[in-house]
């Protein structure tokens, strides 16, 4: 059985999308995953990604954020 731990929740100011970041541990000796859950009205988009992919995504978002300020 998977164990889920909430890491962060935020609302995007433009558009009002709700974003949740959760750590998922499936408990079968596998690696933990990061679940990114985006709610837009009644629609959900869900990604489950590994630590390496999360790091690359975070680095790209941070680089863009720094350029755009």
Predicted feature residues:
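Positively charged, low-complexity terminal tracts
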Residues: 1-69
């Amino acid at each position: 059985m998977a164990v889920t731990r909430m890491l962060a929740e935020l609302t995007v100011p433009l558009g009002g999308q709700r974003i949740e970041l959760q750590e998922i541990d499936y408990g079968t000796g596998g690696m933990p995953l990061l679940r990114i859950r985006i709610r837009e009205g009644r629609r959900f988009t869900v990604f489950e990604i590994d630590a390496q992919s999360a790091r690359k995504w975070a680095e790209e978002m941070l680089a863009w954020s720094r350029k755009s300020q």
